[in-house]
């Protein structure tokens, strides 16, 4: 079945294989590059008809982002074409008391996770990855 699909499907599966958090019932891809998450969202919308309200966005920011938290959240939501209702609690990491604060603004928009809870989609993607890769990983499948 997987080999009959288009390039978007194949790339979406490989993207999840490489960057996704492996779970039995939840898809989660985290990245600092908005294009990665935009592509993954398009894959989910196109091939699995995932509606916006089923997508969740989790931002992970750093202390130097605190003043721009709302702007950064809006950036991710805009890029992913999702309403604010999809945003979950943003985590802002604070500096330790030992930090010299030398590593500021390395990731201007922090990192963000795109999450969809669906056992059926996870299992379909796992099966496709195994078909593309030519291997069996029974622990992935129900």
What are the language-model segments listed below?
Residues 1-142:
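Domain-length accessory/inserted modules outside core catalytic folds
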């Amino acid at each position: 079945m997987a080999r009959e699909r288009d390039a978007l499907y194949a790339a979406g599966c490989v993207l999840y294989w490489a960057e996704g958090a492996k779970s039995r019932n939840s898809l989660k891809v985290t990245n600092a590059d908005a294009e990665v998450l935009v592509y993954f969202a398009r894959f989910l919308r196109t091939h699995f008809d995932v509606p916006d309200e089923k997508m969740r966005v989790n931002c992970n920011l750093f202390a130097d982002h605190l003043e721009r938290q709302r702007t950064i959240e809006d950036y991710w939501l805009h890029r992913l074409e999702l309403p604010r209702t999809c945003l979950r609690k943003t985590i802002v990491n604070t500096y330790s008391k030992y930090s010299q604060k030398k590593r500021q603004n390395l990731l201007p928009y922090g990192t963000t996770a795109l999450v969809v809870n669906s056992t059926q989609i996870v299992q379909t993607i796992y099966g496709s990855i195994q078909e593309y890769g030519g291997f069996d990983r029974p622990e992935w499948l129900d």
